[in-house]
């Protein structure tokens, strides 16, 4: 069972706008906060490392016009409280789920999206769907990814499509299912690949909960965050894709600014196109020194495509080798069965901790 925590809210706030957009205050007539900080233009053009079926290539990001607000909230202030006070009662009610369940580390980065017309329409649609139909995941779990993987802890991003649409499956994490639901077909193939890469990985298809990954900094993000029961893709093209693309963009902008590691593990064309629309298409380059963003691509682990390039990629191990050997950071323990672990990962992480304690 998850526990919602309130984290400090002095996170860096990043906002990207090419032009002034109409916000919901224009609809409801609410006053804009006088505390709004001016935007500061950010830079793009960083390089990153791309792995496609095991081949490393250096890639230049395309220059993307964007603005980054690097001002922080004043110490001891609460972003949600400040934000909520400047909303109309109607909008406050509509955004109650965002205010109550999005982790404090994410909220300052995302809050500008909530006032945009597309998001208001999206919330109106989802609210009506929840009133008229069964919608997955349960409301409290729609943003569980923010609580399980705080913004500044994200190291790896895995992008899915829409949530599982049967009972006791979706809980806000892509590819993951609630216990005791067994692993779906795509996740079974993920386990098969992990077993090839790490022989001591315990492959148990009765287990489908990937919360252990999320708690280590693996963001499991679906591009659509809700779905009507037994109706796949029923909530796609209603605004979630715009929102989750912004989530990815904010992570890229933040990591470009602070140099922290970020890995994209992209399975299938939808995930690849989303990230390439922000980072640019890959192009062959040269050089032995790679900066802080790595992109790894393959076909989707679905039974329909896994045999055409998912198996044998060695991506999970390559991610760990890059984090540990190149970035000097802890590896991800990809184990899923409670009480099990990957020996190689545990030993490497123990060495790293020991080295950090040495004078």
Curated annotation (Swiss-Prot):
Keywords: DNA damage, DNA repair, Hydrolase, Mitochondrion, Nucleus, Transit peptide
Location, primary (coarse class): mitochondrion
Induction: Induced in late G1 and early S phase of the cell cycle.
Name of the top EC class for this enzyme: hydrolase
Location within or outside the cell: Mitochondrion; Nucleus
Biological process annotations from GO: base-excision repair, AP site formation via deaminated base removal; DNA repair
UniProt KW Transit peptide keyword: yes
Protein name: Uracil-DNA glycosylase
